[in-house]
């Protein structure tokens, strides 16, 4: 038999964190006592009220059928209320929120929705490995932009435009720009000033700004959303998740 996978599979390798977790497990088995600074997995359980609510609803016969394709109304309304409470952002649960099986699913959906083969995507370096692996599956042209400590680990928009002027980056064919603040892996925080710059950059070059926002409660007494910026909804998509904020990574609950 000669069964071959699709060519696109050749462009990706085993997930970076999967490889590293195996290495860590091997080192720990040798007694090296490695501290894992990789995946941001909370080591505390969800609130007792959340577990109680899950248990009660799991007993209801109505909880086990197919859901609507856009998620149940109550969940979308709860997400809208959550954004209003914590971010001061108004979202229409009927057409501005889509529940996800964790926000990683959203990285794939967004990439396949916007990227044709050969289209450009701006990805931070260092950055979340999934951005690159999904872009490769989509056949996109990856343009990395460096996050430098001397620049506060923020995008250097002037540097990106200089690379464009030199022909090193084709912003005319670039469809998406990935960013996430608070940033993984640098730990740098964001600000409304940064988000305003991102929105302005996206508007200038017709690039969809994709803000991955699972860590907003980690460094901020008042969590930030890029959607707080005027006009952000016209050019921005934000991913969010209950994994870090509510200690629920195994529940796979996210939103876009």
Where do the language-model regions lie?
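A short helix-loop-beta submotif of the ANL/AMP-binding
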Residues: 137-143
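Conserved PLP-anchoring active-site segment centered on the Schiff-base-forming lysine
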Residues: 113-135
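Short acidic capping loops at alpha-helix termini that bridge into adjacent secondary structure
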Residues: 90-97, 117-120, 173, 233-236
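Active-site phosphate-binding strand-loop segment of PLP-dependent enzymes
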Residues: 147-221
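Active-site PLP attachment segment
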Residues: 229-256
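N-terminal small-domain helix-loop-helix segment of the aminotransferase-like
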Residues: 2-6, 10-102, 109
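Helix C-cap/helix->beta junction micro-motif
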Residues: 30, 138, 204-205
